[in-house]
Amino acid sequence: GRLGLSSLGRLESHTLATLDAVLAVLHQLAAKPWSGRQIEETFADFDLGASLLDRNAREALGEIPDGRRVRIMVTMPSEAANDPDLIKDFLLRGMNIMRVNCAHDGPEEWERMVDHLRRAESETGRPCKIAFDLAGPKLRTGPVSPGPGVIRWKPVRNELGQVTTPAMVAFCAQGESPETHMLAIPVKGLIFEHAQRGDVIELTDTRGRERLLHVVDVDESACICTNDRTGYVVQGTRLRLLRGADLVCEDEVGALPELERSLSLSAGDDLILTSVDIPGRPAVQNEDEVVYRPAQIGCSLREVFTDARPGERIFFDDGKIGGVIRAVRRDEEGERLEVKITHAVNGTAKLRAEKGINLPDTRLRVSALTEKDRQDLEFACKHGDLVSLSFVRRPQDVAELIQALETLAAEQMGIVLKIENRLAVEALPQLLLTAMQRQVISVMVARGDLGVEIGFERMAEIQEEILWLCEAAHVPVIWATQVLESLAKRGLPSRAEVTDAAMSGRAECVMLNKGPHIALALDFLGDVLTRMKGHQTKKSALMRKLSLAENALQ
């Protein structure tokens, strides 16, 4: 402040030295004796903190890349197993750590990815670490019973509602499909063998609307028809082949693949969460549209039914649907949770199979290391440099991983603690102290689940606190989840994503996820991090010469 003393606003990497120096000066100003360290004795510690963090980051995440201070971690898509050029391209564009998600693919695919990377390293002369991300306990929705198969065709219309291109469908034998990419409808009989150009196939669709499809082409395996109306057919829909006023033959639609269904949920709805072996189903209503049997869906983790309590919150599909547990039932019908839905995005949201479940208030008594994780860990120790622990919540989870690594004689393996739930945030000091028994550790701010668990409104605050605490512990941080996601998926970043990418430069590493435009995102992120290198490090502005100010004086 006015005395020229430190505001304590940027003391993380040298906390004790800063406090000692400020106290020493205050005692001198107050003409009081000071028994602690003198100011000159703290000088070395100011530089030591930053150098310790830099050393730990180099050991855990690799050397600092040319031109920037921050490493880039890239998640491997499945196609990388069969595309060595893709991995080489990532490496040339600035990838410093290759992330393999053990929740996808398998050891054969992972080994090919590793081989491709090692070959690319040899060809380019660029080193790259490998991180294996353990899947952890699977907490997801179970399957939903499929609905009846249905096929819909629809013509193309202009802005005036006029048909510009009629719908084209091909009636073909069951199990066959036309060589063209048009919509195929299987039939039980051989209507296509009797059809001729100019014929009409008459049917009544699922909505009771008559449709006349005009035959425009016929070959030995299909008859191709056009129609300028939308239509829906299911298995058993009757077909009548007409030639002028004459009926040539009759047929019916054959077996159709069952449709994947979803549950439509709105605020105020009831939802039953059951064990995963019971298929989910939508709510059932009576003739007055009153629900007499609520929607239900399975949960993949059985410990939920023993550890969850009434009044606790529950979220589905990255927070798109939220609710409160009203009751926990265990009887002859099995274990289940009765949930009252409290919010759904856009008023009504669809819940599908294999969507994430978050229970921020529930203390689940389940190990962060599953049996599959232990098998994957053995592979990771042979081929990788880092292993990321998912679903970590307690110091015991970290201790179990350390013990498993010692059993595998993999003391050199780096540990990444994924902070992705509320309990991990609350226990972060204890998690760090446990992990710091090892020399090579880092922390990942996994903002996907973390945002759901702690609330999106607290996300900015919590990620800052994680950065500060880890800097005080001299532990490197990986900034992860949805970094430049719009750019990676759609080829164009949002404005907020650009700011987020710039802010990520205060961590030691930034993680990019998968997407069709990931190479573009890799270039973009590297450019942003290179530009921000001269402007800021951690919380400190570097006071680089500003081009804007220079231009203003011209």
Cite the ranges covered by each PLM segment:
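Non-catalytic helical/linker scaffolds that mediate oligomerization, partner binding
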Residues: 1-554
